[in-house]
Amino acid sequence: MAKITIDGKACECDEGEYILQVARRCGVFIPALCYLSGGTPTLACRLCMVEADGKRVYSCNAKAKDGMVIYSRSPEIDAEREAITQVYCINHPMACGVCDQSGECELQNLAHLMRTNTQSYAIRDTAREVQDWGYLSYDPSLCIVCERCITAAKDRLGVDAFKLVPRGGDALSKEQKDAMPKDAYAVWNKLQKSLIARVNENDDCVNYGESAAVCPTGALVESAFKYVSNAWELRQIPASNPHSSDCELLYYEIKRRGIGEPREKIYRVSSDINFSVLHAAARFGWDFSNEQASKNEAVFNRIVRGIEDGEIKNIKFNSFITNEEARILELLRQKFKLALINDEALAYQKFLREFSKFSGAKFYNADSQTIKNSDFIVVCGTFLRSDAPNLGYAVNSACKLNKASGIYFHPFCDEGIKGFGKNFIHQPHATGLEAQILLWILQKFGRDLPEWLDAKLAAEFEISRAAAKQNLDEKPADSQNPENSAEANGAGNVASASGAENSASADGAENSAQNSENPAESKISNFARALGLDEQKIDEILAKKEHFSLIIGEDFIRTPNSATLARLAGLVQRYTPLKVLVVPPRTNSLGVALICELSAQMSAGETLGYNEAGDISFGVLEADLDAPSLVQQEGTFTNYDKRVVPTNAALDYGGYELNDIACALGVCAEYAIGYTPSLGADFEPIKFDDLENFYDNGGANHRGYELRNEELAASEDEFEISLSAPLRVGEGEILIYEANPLHQFNKFSGASSALGEAGALYLSPGIAEALGVSAGDVVKIYQADGASNDKKTSGAGKTSAANDKSGAARAKKMDRASDAHKADGAGDENSENGATELVNLKCEIVASVKIDPGFSGAYLPYFDEKLRGEIFFKTSRYASVKIEKISNSKGEGR
C-alpha cells in the first residue's frame, strides 16, 4: 500500500494505481471527459491535469507513488481547463433545451463548473450531418471526440466498433496556437481533424449501447430515445438485469405517459457508466411487461382448487423468477407434495452438489472481479459472448488491462473472441472431450493431488521425439466445414503411457513438454494431444502469470457426463491455483438451485406452467392467467457472483401474482418480499428494504450481500472417470449448437419491441455457401432417428481403460414424448426414411436462414419457443442434423 496526499487529504492506494482513480475513491473531484474507469487512458480531453510533486501530469495516466503530494488546482491549471472548455464550445450548437443529454450532459456541467461565459476562440464550421446507425444515432456537431465510445467498445465489450476518421475542418493557424495554452491547442487541433465513424458501415449497433451510455454529450444516443423525453423529467428505479445471471445494476427511467394518461412508462434503461456494463437485452429489451393484465377469477380459482384437491401435482417453471417466488414454490411443494419441474436449474443443482463434494466448499470460489483481476483465464463449455456476455467483458478487460492470456475451448470459433487479445487463444476441439479439458488442467496445474489421481494423470503422458513432433504438427478439425465431422479431433480415449511428473508450479509456467534427460525426448500429454493443444505455445503464454481462473459453462452441465465433469471441476478448485466460476445458465438458476427441491420426473396429475406450457398456465406471455413480468416485481436474484441482489418494480401491475395464489392456499405473506429474510439456510436474514444496490466512487460493490462460501468436508474417494466420445456426424449431416444470437436471451427479450424477432437457423458464411443457402431462405432441419444428439463414435471409456476398443452404445430409441414436439407435417411414416418403428421417426422443424459472420458453425436459438429447436437438444447442446433447402428468400421452391 502507498500513501499519497491530494489537496491536503491523505489517501491510501495501491502502488501504481492511477491518480484519478484514487482521487475519485477518496472523494476528491478532478474533471475528466474522456476517462472511463476500467478503460485505457486516451488523454483526449486533458482536463484531468494535476500537479504531482511539482510536475504537471495527467491524473488519468499518471500512477501514484508512495509519499506523492498532489494538487488538483492552481491558477495555471484553472486557466488551461477554462481554455479547453471554451474549445469544446466552439461551434457547439447552443440547443441544450432540446438536446437529449441536457440535464445530464457532462460538457454542460463542466461549463457551469468553470463558469464559462465568454468565447475567446473561433473558426469556420464544417458541415456535419446527423447519421442513423440503427439502434444508435450520431450527431457529429455535438461530438467532442473524447473517444469514450471507442474505449467502451474496445476495452469493455472487446470489439472494434468505432474509429476516428478525418473531419475535414480548417487547420489551425500559428496565431491561434500562440494565443492559447498548449493543452487547449492540442485538444482543439484534434477536434478540427477528427470525427467518429463505425468500423462496419452496415452494423446496426445493437450490441453497442454501452458506447452511447458513456457519451458525455448528446452526440451518440439511443435512436429510440431521441426527442422523446427530457432527462430531468425521468425518475430512476434501481433494479437488476432480468435477462441473464450477471443481474447487473440498471435503472429503469420512467415517467407518466402524458397529461391525460397517468400510467407510468419506461422510456429507457440506464446504468452506472463507470462500473456496470449492460448487454443489448438489458439495455434495449425491457418492454415485455404485461401492462394489460387483469384478474381472471375463474382461472385463479381453478388453479387454487386444483392444487388443494390434488389434481395439479406439478409446477413447471423456469429460472426467470425471483428468489422470493422460488421460496413460495418450495413452500407449496412441501405443503401439497408437488413436483417442481425446472430442467436447467435441476441440472445446475446436481452439478453444484457434486462439485461441492470434491471441492471442499459450498460454492465455486471465483466471481467476475476475480476474472477481471486474472492474468491467465481458461474458458470452456460456453459460447461465452452469447451465454454470459458480461463475463466475456470481464475476460476482455483482463486481457486489455492486465495483459492476460488464456484459452477458449469450444468446438466452434467465435470471431469476437479474437478481439480480446493475441494471447487469448481459441482452441477448437471435438464435442465430448469436456473431461479431457479438466484432466489436462489437473495434469498441468495440479499440486498435492490424491495418489490415485496423480497416478492416472502421470500415466497419460508419452515421452518420445515422435510424439512431440506429432503434437506440434497436429491440426484441429475445422468446425466451419460441414463435411468435417467432430470425430476428426480423435476419439474419447487417450492411450496410456507411464512415467511423468504431473504437478505444475504455482505460477503455472512449468513446461509440460520440457526436455527429459535425453534432450531429444519430450513429454507430451495425451489430453493435450486429443484437444489439439500446442503445449509449447501454452507454456509461452503462461510465463510469469500469477492469477488464474476457470470459467465453466452450460455445455458441461447439460451432458450425460456432467457428474464426472462436476467432480473434476471440484478437484480443479481444490488442487490447482485456478479460481473456478460455474456459470448459472439463466437469470436466477443459482437461486432456484439453492432454494427449491427439484424433481427430475413429473408426478401423475396435471401441470401448472409458470411462464411455461402446462395443462393450465400462469405467465406473462400468452397464458391462461396473467402474471407479472420481472419489470413489475420487487424481489431478489442470486447472480453468478453469488450475490443476492435486489430488483424493484418499475411499472404497476393489475393482475394476480404468485403470492396471491400462495395466500389462497394458506402459504401467506403480505408481500412476496416478506420472504426475503427467510429464503433458506444459505441466505442471510436481511429484509428487502435493508438491501443496498449501488457501486461507490471507487467501484466497491454495495449490491445486496454475498453468500457465505462455507468449507465442507471434501471427498477423498477415488471415482471412475468417464470419458465421452465425440458426437458422430454422419454423411450429409452437420453439427449444430443450441445458442442464442448475442442480443437475445429468452422469450421475454424476443418479445420486446426493440429486439422482437423470430428465431432462425444461424449459419456462418462458409457453411451457408457449402449448403447452397442464403439469408432468408427457408430450410428443413431434421433427424432421421430423432436422437442424433445421443449418437457417439467409438472410443468412449475410462482413463484406466485407454485401449478399450468396444466403443459407446448406439443411439437409444427416441422417447415417445419428443414426437409430440414435431412441427406440423413432420415425419411421413411412409417416406423413404420413415417407418413404423419408433427409432426411425423423424424430428423435424422448418426455419428461415440468417447469416452470422461472427460464428464458425451453425446454431439454433431457444429464445423463440415457437421454433421448437429444443427437440434436437435433449441431453446436450450439440446435435447432428440434416438441412434441406425448401425455398429461397423470394418464396420460390427448389
Listing of model-derived features with the role each one plays in the protein:
Residues 289-296, 342-473, 480, 515-530, ...:
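Glycine-rich, acidic loop regions that bind phosphate or pyrophosphate groups
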Residues 46-204, 208, 212-213, 217-241, ...:
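Fe-S ferredoxin-like electron-transfer domains
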Residues 242-243, 258-307, 313-321, 865-866, ...:
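Catalytic P-loop NTP-binding/switch module of NTPases
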Residues 316-367, 567-599:
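Anionic-ligand anchoring segments at beta-strand to alpha-helix junctions in alpha/beta enzyme folds, i.e.
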Residues 207-267, 374-376, 380-406, 611-623, ...:
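Phosphate/diphosphate-binding loops
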Residues 1, 30, 35-37, 330, ...:
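A cross-kingdom feature strongest in bacterial/archaeal respiratory oxidoreductases
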Residues 422-478, 515-606, 685-686, 691-704, ...:
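Active-site phosphate/pyrophosphate-binding segments
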Residues 94-120, 129, 149, 159-169, ...:
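N-terminal leader/propeptide and maturation segments of large enzyme subunits in energy/redox metabolism
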